[in-house]
């Protein structure tokens, strides 16, 4: 093989790799801290649903996750999707991002930038900025539903710094008729509601992560999606993410 031909083949291969990379949307995780008891939250919930459905940012795959906090539950309406763990997670972000306090609705983009869930302009700018950040490859495989439990395998590429791997089982869609509280009399819709959220493991600097996870599901709910992401320690920047739909299947509780 001549040097010219070898050089030409290598050039074509390099261009092919660049094209493939350019065609792969960059995953950007959008966490929305929300509550059915908060009158400012429904517009943010609608915004999250729009982002999920339309994917408006070229070159970006927005991976949305609704995390319902519980500090509104004593204000006239108990949100059935609320979980104190999300209140704690939001407070950790408030400490990390040096905020005076937690609030709803709040968006956190890739663990690095926060904004009001109703500030669409600031959020959109954060999505654009996140697109250029390097990301670790992350894959979800071998998913299996059985007796109200989801099992899956998670693999990542080498991480640039030590990181935690989180996995969330999220309900695709839900609706509620709120009877009391600030949203009393209103019909609310949600998307990607986190129902189970666990830390799957850790990866050391320069190493890849590979592990199996087992998540308990809420019976008779569905369909679901599985979301995984790699996050720097102490709820730092999210450096990789993936989402896998479970289609139209529901999870059923075993006997």
What are these regions (language model features)?
Residues 42-56:
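Typically the conserved alpha-helix immediately C-terminal to a functionally engaged Cys/Sec
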Residues 24-39, 65, 167:
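Short active-site neighborhood of thiol/selenol oxidoreductases, capturing the structured segment around
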Residues 58-87:
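Thiol-based oxidoreductase modules, predominantly thioredoxin-like and allied folds used
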Residues 78-106, 112-255:
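Short, conserved sequence motifs used for protein processing/export or organelle targeting and
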Residues 18-22:
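Sec/Tat signal peptide C-region and signal peptidase I cleavage site
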Residues 1-9:
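Bacterial N-terminal signal peptides that target proteins for export
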Residues 9-17:
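Bacterial N-terminal signal peptides
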Residues 35-45, 80:
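Short, thiol/selenol-centered motifs that function as redox-active sites or metal-ligating centers
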């Amino acid at each position: 093989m001549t040097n010219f031909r070898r050089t030409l083949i290598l050039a074509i291969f390099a261009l092919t790799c660049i094209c493939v990379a350019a065609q792969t949307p960059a995953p950007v995780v959008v966490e929305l801290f929300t509550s059915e008891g908060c009158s400012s939250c429904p517009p943010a919930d609608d915004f999250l649903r729009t982002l999920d459905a339309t994917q408006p940012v070229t070159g970006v795959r927005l991976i949305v996750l609704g995390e319902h906090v519980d500090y509104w539950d004593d204000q006239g309406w108990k949100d059935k999707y609320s979980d104190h763990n999300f209140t704690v997670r939001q407070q950790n972000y408030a400490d990390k991002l040096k905020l005076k306090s937690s609030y709803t609705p709040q968006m956190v983009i890739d663990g690095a930038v926060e904004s009001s869930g109703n500030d669409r302009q600031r959020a959109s700018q954060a999505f654009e900025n996140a697109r250029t950040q390097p990301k670790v490859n992350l894959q979800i495989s071998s998913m299996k539903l059985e007796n109200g439990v989801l099992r899956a395998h998670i693999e990542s590429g080498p991480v640039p710094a030590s990181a935690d791997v989180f996995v969330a089982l999220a309900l695709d869609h839900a609706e509620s008729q709120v009877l009391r509280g600030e949203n009393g009399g209103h019909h609310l819709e949600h998307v990607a509601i986190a129902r189970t959220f666990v830390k799957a493991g850790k990866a050391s600097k320069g190493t890849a992560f590979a592990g199996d996870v087992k998540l308990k599901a809420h019976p008779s709910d569905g369909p679901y999606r599985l979301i995984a992401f790699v996050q720097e320690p102490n709820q730092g920047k999210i450096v990789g993410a993936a989402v896998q739909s479970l289609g139209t299947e529901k999870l059923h509780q075993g006997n």
